[in-house]
Curated annotation (Swiss-Prot):
It catalyses: 5-methyltetrahydropteroyltri-L-glutamate + L-homocysteine = tetrahydropteroyltri-L-glutamate + L-methionine. This is 5-methyltetrahydropteroyltriglutamate--homocysteine methyltransferase. InterPro entries: Cbl-indep_Met_Synth_N (IPR013215), Cobalamin-indep_Met_synthase (IPR006276), Met_Synth_C/arc (IPR002629), UROD/MetE-like_sf (IPR038071). Catalyzes the transfer of a methyl group from 5-methyltetrahydrofolate to homocysteine resulting in methionine formation. 5-methyltetrahydropteroyltri-L-glutamate binds at residues 17-20, 115, 514-515, 560, 604. Belongs to the vitamin-B12 independent methionine synthase family. The active site is at residue 693.
Amino acid sequence: MTIFNHTLGFPRIGLNRELKKAQEDYWSGNLLYEDFLCVGSQLRRENWKKQKDAGIDYIPVGDFAWYDHVLSTSMMLGNIPERHLNVNDNKIDLDCLFRIARGCSPDVAASEMTKWFNTNYHYIVPEFNKNRILKFSWKQILEETDEALLLGYKVKPIILGPITYLWLGKIKGEYFDRLDLLKNILPIYKQVLRELSQRNIDFVQIDEPALVLDLPEKWKKAYSYAYEYLNGTTKILLTTYFDSIEHNIEYIRDLPIYGIHIDLVFGKYNLFDFNSKLPKEWILSLGVINGRNVWRADLIKLFKSISTILKFRKKLLIGSSCSLLHSPIDLQKEKNLDKESKKWFSFAVQKCTELSLLSKALNKNDTDSIQKWCSSIYERNFSKRVQKIEVQNRLSEILNVNFKRSDSYNIRSREQKKKFNLPILPTTTIGSFPQTLQIRKLRRDYKQGLINDVDYEIGIKKHIKEVIKEQEKLGIDVLVHGEPERNDMVEYFGENLDGFIFTDNGWVQSYGSRCVKPPIIIGDVSRLKPITVKWSKYAQSLTDKPVKAMLTGPVTILFWSFPREDISLEKIAKQIGLALRDEVLDLEKEKIEIIQIDEPALREGLPLRKSLWNEYLSWAVDAFRLSSSGVKNTTQIHTHMCYCEFHDIMHAISFLDADVITIETARSDMELLKSFKTFKYPNEIGPGVYDIHSSNIPSITSIKFLLNKAIAYIPVERIWVNPDCGLKTRNWNETILALKNMVCAAKEMRDKIKKIT
């Protein structure tokens, strides 16, 4: 038996973020349509070549997306929201795709965006309408398959599976069972598979990550119906990732498919036992190389594990655990990483090399080459940069009292209301203000040593002063300093905490054109000196209004970084929590008495199986409270969350015991607030009243409409008024117009409430 290798997908953004730049140029009218298409074609060709040159046998196609692969599937199925379809003669084209993703006017809003399972990638949520007619409308998968075949590659097309697609979407309008749409979309899937079968391909990868979830019974049974219907078109490799599918094996093993892919990184399998449950004729694809982290793989360990089942399986593939979408592209692009640490890492291109080395070692039963690859892993175990005894000692000395505020919210709230004397429906923002070219240049010049500390501080303070001035002119109640010193909400803190390392080009896609460069946690974490105190203190000196300090929470820093794999996530989170606790207390000493600790990643850290939620939420909440609980009653703690559903973790959110929580709700039309109807959240809430991810300027009427919706769920005396998220990606004109309308809406609502009372 020859063992072949494959990846489940490759990063689509380009080595130098070419896709991001092309998207933004196209949206602004600075790039022609034909030239934009050429950028996409060039990126695909480069990706295929990189994988082939690294030794990948089956080259994936269909993993490229102009914005998001779930949105591409909606386009393929012709599942276009009516408000976007009627803009341009019902034409389903690239501009239609971008309208769905970004919106084009207040009346033609973007579709909702949310997290892709428990990752930091975001997808555009499909909208389902009972009466929508669906048909094969977007032939990107066929065109790109032909493109790769013409170049001589052994091609493996990738399609998001029908059940997972329906699971990820939401009903708009009249309620009906989403599974009723299965009979409408399966003929389209069948048509696509039949057309692919006419090409020179061995099999098609159909992604069904929903199989790792605790699905309702009828959804499990739907798999049988769907894949019986698709049987006979072409060979199907059913692909799962992010967790184990053992709990659903009885529904999977009878499916008429070519084989199954499992994630051996995040799924806890007894491989020998699991293999025995599968049909002998199936090909088994083992996801052994972590697609979501940057550490070099222990190929010797993997060789031994895979070798145990070789004689029991006639056909075997090895691959990445999931798409390499979540990994930076090429470690060789990093010129400033020190020699010691650089040997510890593996990015997408190197992960392809790992798959090639491992498949060759297994086929030859020879471990010489992989032993050499693993030598740096063993060296890391003895590095002084990893283990720090003083951090470990402090963590071991934590007491229960460190996780609790001294008094309840009701007592704190009375003291805070007396101290701050804010109006009903107080206005604030989430933290960041527009990151202008001047701000970016200032930071870049400082980082490159072109300006000194004094000039940098003068420049940053100038921008802070402008932000404070604009907020005062607008009449905002609680101000922020605007974060001009921060390139990214996680990277900035990582740069100022010990235990992190940074890349120059380790970009990964978060959504659309938004890319992030996560820091890497390489050792025990601690704070060496104050991080934000200087800037917040200066901002507060410019105004009599309260200024809110902005910190990124421990769970978000953890999950938006590439974490260590040698200790538990809980330990890392609590180390970060202790470091932030020091920062919070220093802010309080300097009379900064409203402090926001952002935790947008709280929900994405949830295990995909609900049976494991309580354990995770227990330590995640503890890490937050460790950072926030040391302050006085009069210091108001805020937290912010975005892009997520809250209804099933409301108890955990309440246990955070933040005085105020601000949340993303505008894009979902306040739908998330339904959670507050059944769960009486005890503290204050700022439901986002407009979507900052769209360039649309919200009207006063639309903001008041959303506030009235919020009042139906939350007592008005506990509501704050704020945008959905930070304003970093918006320009100043959009920001001023939107905030002006937000403040006007809040004032009009106050006047209305006064008249009623």
